[in-house]
Design a protein with these regions (language model features):
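Active-site groove signature of glycoside hydrolases
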Residues: 36-58
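N-terminal binding-site loop/beta-alpha segment at the start of enzyme catalytic domains
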Residues: 1-12, 44
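Active-site mouth loops of central-metabolism enzymes
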Residues: 12-31, 57, 154-164
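Beta-strand segments within the central parallel beta-sheet cores of soluble alpha/beta enzyme folds
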Residues: 8-10, 47-50, 84-85
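Beta/alpha (TIM)-barrel catalytic core signal, keyed to glycine-rich beta->alpha loops juxtaposed to Asp/Glu
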Residues: 54-188
Length: 188
């Protein structure tokens, strides 16, 4: 069927139990969420199990239990690859030290890379480029999020760069970075 043609990415820590997006590091809530998603997606495997939205080193310290859960499911064959979603180079670098990551979901666009705007423009240009190179050197792929900065880069009035970029320019900018395997543009 169709499942063999798709790659499924689940974020451990994204919580929809209240009917809207939420974030949690509670292991029981995460287990319940993952079980619910597997059941509703009618699958027993997760191609990419992501430690979700860890942007502060203090959150990473709290999230070790979640990472252990992902690794446990990987040992059982439920999760195939381990990932991390973050906007913070220091957090990604810290987890790269553990040698457990296969993929990182990271925000890449010219505004963020050159600190031109947005709450997710974390880290300086050199720190961010060093991270991309490290991921490539260590065989950890990068899946890009926020390539359009939530649409801001596509509109001259909202672009922190002072001019509008095209979708093609934003996607190509991200694809040209070391380690980048794919760009996931947002949907409106």
């Amino acid at each position: 069927g169709r499942r063999e043609k798709m790659r499924l990415q689940l974020h451990f820590g994204a919580d929809y139990s209240a009917g809207a997006y939420g974030w949690t590091l509670d292991r029981d809530a995460i287990r319940a969420s993952v079980d619910w998603q597997l059941r509703n997606l009618q699958t027993d495997t997760i191609d990419f199990g992501f430690l979700h939205c860890i942007d502060e080193l203090r959150d990473l310290e709290t999230a070790w239990g979640t990472l252990e859960e992902i690794l446990r499911l990987k040992d059982q064959g439920v999760v195939r690859h381990v990932g991390l979603s973050s906007h913070t180079p220091a957090v990604v670098n810290r987890l790269l030290e553990e040698k457990v990551l296969d993929l990182v979901m990271f925000s890449i666009n010219p505004a963020y890379d050159y600190s031109a705007g947005g709450e997710f423009a974390i880290g300086g240009a050199q720190e961010r480029m060093d991270l991309y190179r490290r991921c490539e050197a260590e065989g950890v792929g990068i899946s890009v999020m926020k390539a359009f900065s939530g649409g801001q880069l596509l509109d001259e009035k909202t672009s922190p760069l002072g001019c509008a970029l095209t979708e093609y320019q934003c996607i190509q900018y991200a694809l040209d970075k070391p380690g980048v395997l794919t760009v996931l543009p947002g949907v409106r």
